[in-house]
Structures are given as structure tokens and as C-alpha cells.
Regions:
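Q-loop/switch helix immediately C-terminal to the Walker
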Residues: 26, 33-47
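Catalytic Walker B motif of ABC-type/P-loop ATPase nucleotide-binding domains
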Residues: 102-105
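Charged, flexible cofactor/metal-binding loops and thiol motifs
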Residues: 164-246
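P-loop NTP-binding/switch modules centered on Walker-like glycine-rich loops
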Residues: 107, 111, 115-193
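A short, proline-enriched helix->beta-strand linker immediately N-terminal to the Walker B motif
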Residues: 96-100
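Conserved ABC ATPase signature
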Residues: 77-81, 85
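Conserved ABC ATPase "signature" region
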Residues: 55-72, 181-182
Length: 246
């Protein structure tokens, strides 16, 4: 998104920055408390100065209807709305510049359970109507299962498994992914003892292991795992950062 510059390496994006937008985790803190909702929704266009105030107001009304906000509420301030309504406003703002990609950073974790499903279903509908690509960041496997076509599992900032959602979520291959999914509550499925984590502290980003980042906590760790791993493609097409899982 360009908000932080990388300390090393590079990232490449195509064309204008407007093709990417973001929906943040906490809708209240991501909305300007002093602006009316219609101004918030069209803020990307106001910054770009590509349209008149009348055009922006009309667009705000159109997007408000799409996300389930009544147009007559557009002159209100953010504090007058519920958490779910604020997130709908944030989604409308992300749509206003007609992006190709929207980054969703834990879009439902700050919301009540009763509202989460509504927001997820809204996102699915908008994706179909606008042809959007989502980059969804979440720790909630149920949300990932509901929303994702492809899944990347990360551990200490590294992708350890990448593949189709069906592959990764039903037949995880990397030891960390297996532990992650096995930790989900299940009535008739106890956690296998041999897959229990070793009693070690989670390393911080200043004291990362020299080899595989998961080496000190992995139940399958053996000689060879102390060597730094890179992503490799398995026969089924998924990418793994574990030589034992290939």
C-alpha cells in the first residue's frame, strides 16, 4: 500500500496506487471522526481531485446503497454508527476509487459475532459484482475457509505453505500448518500427542533461528532442518518451505 517502505528488498505494483485500497481491522479508528460519512467514502477521490463535489456526493450515495447504508445518513459523523455500519462505510470508501485489489486486514475481528457473517457475505457479493481481488489477512480459519481461493500460511513473517484453499485446509502439508489446523476445537478429534509443540519460547524477530524458523518448535525437526529453507513446489502444485514435507 506504500504506507511503509521496506527496509530491504523491493515490491512491484502495476500502474496507479489507486488500483489498490485497504479495509482496516478497527473501523472506528480508520474513519476521520470530524468528516461526514459521504466525505469519508469519497476521500480517495477528494485527494486525487478528479471529480466535483456534486459527483462525489452522488457516488457516495450509490456506494452507500451497495454496502447497506441508507443515503439519508450520509451527513452523520462516524460515532453515530454501529461497528458493523462503520465497517460498511470503510468498505464503501475502498470501492470509491474503483480498485482492482482490496487488502482486508482482519475485517471482522473487531465486530460482534452476529455482524461478522453479514460483512463477509457483503464482501463476497461485492467481489462478484465488481470483479475484485481480495488479499485477506486473518487468524480466523473459518473466515479463510469461507472467503479464500488460495491460502498462504505465514510463520514469523515467512510463507511456509502456499496453495489452493481446498488443498491447504483439508490436507495441510507443512508441520506448522498441520498444528495450526489441529489446534481448532473439535468434539471428537483430540490433538495428537506426537504433534504437540516442544516446550520452547517463541523466538522474536531479533533472534530468528539460523535455519528453518520453525526448527526449534517442530515435532518433525531432524538433521538438515538447521539449514535455511526456501519455498519449493511439490507435485500437487503447492509451495512449501519444508524439505520433509515435499
Amino acid at each position: 500500500m506504500g504506507m511503509l517502505q521496506p527496509s530491504h528488498g523491493q515490491y512491484i505494483r502495476s500502474g496507479s496506487q489507486r488500483i489498490m485500497q485497504m479495509v482496516f481491522q478497527d473501523p472506528l479508528s480508520s474513519l476521520n471522526p470530524r468528516l461526514p460519512v459521504w466525505r469519508i467514502i469519497t476521500e480517495p477521490l477528494w485527494i486525487a481531485k478528479h471529480s466535483s463535489e456534486q459527483q462525489r456526493r452522488a457516488l457516495a450515495e450509490e456506494l452507500a446503497v451497495q454496502v447497506g447504508i441508507r443515503p439519508e445518513y450520509l451527513d452523520r459523523l462516524p460515532h453515530a454508527f454501529s461497528g458493523g455500519q462503520r465497517q460498511r462505510i470503510a468498505i464503501a470508501r475502498a470501492l470509491s476509487s474503483q480498485p482492482d485489489v482490496i487488502v482486508l486486514d482482519e475485517p471482522t475481528s473487531a465486530l460482534d459475532i452476529s455482524v461478522q457473517a453479514q460483512i463477509l457475505n457483503l464482501l463476497v457479493t461485492l467481489q462478484e459484482n465488481h470483479g475484485l481481488t481480495y488479499v485477506l489477512i486473518s487468524h480466523n480459519v473459518s473466515v479463510i475457509r469461507h472467503m479464500s481461493d488460495r491460502v498462504a500460511v505465514m510463520y514469523l513473517g515467512q510463507i511456509v505453505e502456499l496453495g489452493d484453499a481446498q488443498q491447504v485446509l483439508t490436507a495441510p502439508a507443512h508441520p506448522y500448518t498441520r498444528l495450526l489446523l489441529d489446534s481448532l476445537p473439535a468434539i471428537d478429534k483430540p490433538l495428537e500427542e506426537e504433534w504437540a509443540l516442544r516446550k520452547t519460547d517463541l523466538p522474536g524477530n531479533r533472534t530468528l533461528p539460523q535455519g528453518c524458523f520453525f526448527y526449534e518448535r517442530c515435532p518433525l525437526a531432524t538433521h538438515g532442518c538447521e539449514v535455511r529453507q526456501s519455498l519449493a513446489i511439490r507435485e500437487d502444485g503447492r509451495e512449501l518451505r519444508c524439505w520433509r514435507a515435499l
